A protein has these predicted regions:
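N-terminal Rossmann-like FAD-binding beta1-loop-alpha1 element of flavoenzymes
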Residues: 1-26, 328, 332
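Short hydrophobic core segments
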Residues: 2-4, 27, 126-135, 299, ...
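Short, small/polar residue-rich loop motifs at catalytic or cofactor-binding pockets
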Residues: 7, 199-201, 278-280, 313-314
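Conserved N-terminal/central alpha/beta ligand/cofactor-binding core
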Residues: 29-115, 203-220, 239, 245-247
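A conserved short coil-to-beta-strand element within the FAD-binding core of flavoproteins
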Residues: 116-126
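Glycine-rich loop(s) and the adjacent beta-strand/alpha-helix scaffold that form part
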Residues: 131-185, 317, 323-326, 330
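An anion/pyrophosphate-binding glycine-rich loop and adjacent beta-alpha core
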Residues: 161, 165-264
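A glycine-rich dinucleotide-binding beta-alpha-beta segment and adjacent secondary-structure elements
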Residues: 261-311
Length: 333
């Protein structure tokens, strides 16, 4: 079995396939395994109540949402059984439950268990095939003049491969999960993606480059809605305005030290930010068995799949974990 992509979904799929007696081969076009999981805070979570999941992501596929919600706890226990040690035994969010892992340690555990992981290898046409190439965040960001907040290889290879073979899409191809990050000339490395995120939990006002306030409600708890709103402003940038009392706040200090722009005037700080794309939320349409609609012998998992979090946000790593396991189990049938 060929698995395209060596991030969370692809590695999980390969590990589960080996457990079931298959001989998977993971083809990762990048220079390292781990995908965007390696760059994340690595919290793998679900909503406490399924109704909250539906309310948070009302446009998503209800069957896929329920599948992820119902199977995540067992999938997390399976990760731990492989030797992955949680950093947190639960989330710190009263709306959610899950576990946090060290992303490097988790990647190492999965790579060891996956077996045949080949780097700098691209998609091949052999089937059965599992697509787990990480969506098209990089392509989307470049097309729209936004920052990239993910691994540099999520360019839509899986989506293109599937569409060429008759697949259809699900979800909104213009919807993404992302963050507001320090705007250029700030210097942002992969190791800064979590640390430099500008999350202000209702303590900021938001104006665009024309000085117009563009987001006059409280952001959602995850603030991805705010990042998407910033992306729609001229230049994909904005100014977050907070009290000058925050001048030594870690978020302000980090932005300033990264070379970002902080302007203090009239008792306020103006922080220059830009929208950054972590992963796309539209993508390949699949069913509950992770089969790609319209293409025999083709499966998909992770950010290549669309239509799970439409209209809101849910854990991309949770979807990758659950669907990666299911893809392996379905391929065995």
């Amino acid at each position: 079995m060929i698995v395209a992509g060596g991030g969370m979904a692809g590695l999980v799929c390969a590990v589960r396939a080996r457990e079931l007696g298959l001989r998977p081969r993971v083809l990762e076009k990048g220079t390292r395994a781990g995908g965007s999981m390696l760059l994340s805070s690595c919290v793998i979570w679900r909503h406490l109540e399924f109704d909250e999941f539906r309310a948070e992501c009302p446009g998503g596929d209800e069957a896929l949402q329920r599948l992820i919600w119902e199977r995540l706890d067992d999938a997390l226990a399976w990760l731990v059984s492989l030797g992955a040690e949680p950093v947190w035994e639960d989330t710190e969010n009263p709306r959610t439950t899950g576990k946090r892992f060290d992303p490097r340690s988790l990647t190492e555990v999965l790579v060891r268990a996956a077996g045949d992981v080949r780097l700098e290898e691209r998609l091949r046409p052999e089937l059965p095939l599992v697509l787990a190439t990480g969506g098209f965040a990089v392509r989307y960001a470049h097309e729209h003049g936004l920052l990239v907040r993910c691994n540099p290889w999520s360019e839509g290879d899986g989506l293109e491969f599937a569409l060429e073979r008759g697949a259809t899409t699900a979800g909104d191809l213009d919807e993404f999960y992302g963050r507001a990050m320090p705007a250029p000339p700030a210097r942002i490395g992969e190791e800064d993606y979590v640390r430099l995120s500008q999350l202000w939990d209702g303590e900021a006002r938001f104006v665009n480059e024309d000085g117009d306030e563009f987001f006059e409600r409280l952001p959602a708890w995850h603030e991805s809605d705010l990042a998407q709103a910033v992306a729609r402003q001229p230049g994909g940038t904005a100014w977050f305005i907070v009290s000058a009392d925050f001048r030594e706040d870690p978020r302000v200090v980090a932005l300033r030290e990264a070379g970002g722009t902080v302007v203090e005037e009239d008792g306020e700080l103006r922080l220059h930010v830009a929208a950054a794309v972590t992963h796309t939320q539209g993508g390949i349409k699949i069913g509950p068995a992770a089969r790609v609609h319209g293409v025999d012998g083709l499966f998909a998992a992770g950010a290549d799949v669309g239509g799970i979090s439409t209209g809101g946000y849910s854990s991309g790593l949770a979807a990758a974990l659950v669907l990666g396991r299911i893809a392996a189990e379905t391929a065995l049938r």
